[in-house]
Amino acid sequence: PPTTTDALLNAAKALHDPKRGQHGIAWNAARGTALGHTFLMALADFGQPILDLPPIAGGFDTRHLSERRYRFTIDTDAGLRAAEFLLELLKYSPPEILSMSWYERIRPYAAGRIAMTYGYTLLAPYFELDKNSPAQGNTGYLPHPAGSGANPVAPVGGYIMGLPANLPVDRVPAAVEALIVFTSPAAQKLYVQNGSRTNPRYSVGSDPDVRRISPIFEAVDAMSWRDELQFWPRPPVPEIGEIIQICGEEFHNMLRGIIPPQEALRRAQQRADAVIKKTQFT
């Protein structure tokens, strides 16, 4: 399996056979949020976060984000390598790639028309639970292949559950109890047994019953022990949604051939700087 971006491109090229309706790879390339996420993840694959975070062992330090002393780092050498990598991926992608997001990408993979795909484990049931899918039982799971000099990263996604600030006081204990139940090992195992392919608990992921259901759990556990599961590729700052949208617009123009990579990087950086100026200094 490919562990570097160069090896990934070589594999995609070898597996790409459009005359037979087979394409090498799929990824989120739809305009806006979908492609914006892809650029952030590609940037991480080349060893750089979207913010000027200080490096630490195993990644980058996100402990001081609340101080708001950061800037976005898009127009960089790593940014250019990431942009050029996306252009290379385009060569071995299906013709509708520029309108593909999460679901549009996983469906043709499950149907066997795409050899490889980037994706979160959340959508793995599309093929793992489909006995008619060619991908069922024939899929392996890897962290993102890394660019030259970088380490493999598996970006963490997920959802946050919390208590609304306006919740009446008398309802708080029941809400807290519900959160405890939802996130308990027993509930997490029940989700997996009923089709879920995500799990935030080590104890459940190492449960033999769970391990037998899908190879995902052993693969993700191994990524965690290798310190490959990281959330710095998509740092939780107030501006991140707008920055993702900006990247998804400018790099979509690049993939369509409207502007070159350097221009896409410059435009995205200028727009990101304007966002920072607006949010941090007003």
Predicted regions and their residues:
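Short, charged, surface-exposed loops that flank catalytic or proteolytic processing sites
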Residues: P1-L8, N253-R266
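Short helices/loops that flank or line small-molecule/ion binding pockets
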Residues: L9-P18, Y103-R113, T117, E249, ...
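Flexible glycine/proline-enriched surface loops and loop-helix/loop-strand junctions
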Residues: R20-W27, T62-F72, Y92, A110, ...
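C-terminal lobe and pocket-closing loops
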Residues: L122-P134, G147-E249, F281
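Extracytoplasmic/periplasmic substrate-binding proteins
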Residues: T38-M41, D45-F46, L80-A174
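Bilobed periplasmic-binding protein-like "clamshell/Venus-flytrap" ligand-binding domains
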Residues: H16-A29, S184-G195, A274-T282
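Periplasmic solute-binding protein
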Residues: P1, L9, N28-E67, P155-P164, ...
